[in-house]
């Protein structure tokens, strides 16, 4: 959640931003292994602060799927979701076979090559894998919990099959993600919602969305979406 501190500052004091922490971080409760259970848990936590809608929801990367599932569960419970913002996430239900997956990796490699960051990206990925293995083997209790939760959440997202959301969605993409087939992403997300998919492009990398200067651009896009939703 600390990665969203910059975003919160850019949104300003008059626009609170609440982050929700995965269950199991304290070691006293089991971690979730299904996106549906994560969403139900977050809704329960959210309702301690705001029992009823209208709700303004958002998620970044893998968190977008959880926010999308939360929106569906809230609607099923008769609550209003005034705004749903999804940030730089491919749509669920794709479950690509191995060949398209290799094509996807090749497209990403080409982007980093053109952006002159290919070797940096490869080194970062290797370092991330190494750190996760290190956390599991020799890390302290808290570090091992984090690594275990990461693995559980990765499996949960692989297994997730989404339902339908009834309403509009604001979709914010990084410049990095636009090397992927825009039409495919747009069409697939559009199939999962009944309203309009409003897409905005932020001129930064995926990770840069919550860093400087990308966080400012992301906050501006979210702020504009909030104002539009409130005006309806």
Where are these regions (language model features)?
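A hydrolase-biased, glycine/serine/histidine/acidic-enriched motif that marks catalytic-domain neighborhoods
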Residues: 1-232
């Amino acid at each position: 959640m600390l990665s969203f501190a910059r975003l919160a500052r850019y949104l300003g004091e008059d626009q609170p931003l609440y982050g929700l922490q995965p269950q199991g971080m304290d070691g006293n409760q089991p971690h979730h292994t299904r996106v549906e259970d994560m969403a139900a848990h977050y809704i329960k936590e959210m309702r301690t602060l705001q029992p009823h809608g209208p709700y303004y929801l958002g998620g970044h990367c893998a968190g977008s799927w959880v926010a999308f599932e939360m929106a569906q569960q809230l609607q099923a419970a008769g609550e209003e979701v005034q705004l749903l913002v999804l940030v730089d996430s491919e749509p669920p239900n794709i479950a690509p076979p191995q060949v398209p997956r290799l094509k996807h990796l090749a497209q990403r490699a080409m982007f980093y090559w053109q952006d002159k960051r290919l070797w940096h990206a490869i080194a970062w990925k290797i370092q991330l894998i190494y750190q996760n293995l290190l956390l599991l083997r020799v890390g302290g209790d808290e570090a091992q919990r984090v690594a275990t939760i990461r693995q559980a959440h990765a499996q949960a997202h692989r297994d997730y099959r989404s339902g339908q959301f009834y309403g509009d969605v604001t979709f914010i993409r990084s410049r990095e993600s636009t090397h992927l087939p825009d039409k495919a992403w747009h069409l697939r997300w559009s199939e999962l919602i009944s309203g309009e998919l409003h897409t905005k492009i932020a001129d930064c990398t995926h990770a840069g969305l919550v860093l400087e200067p990308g966080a400012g651009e992301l906050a501006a896009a979210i702020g504009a979406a909030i104002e539009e939703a409130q005006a309806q």
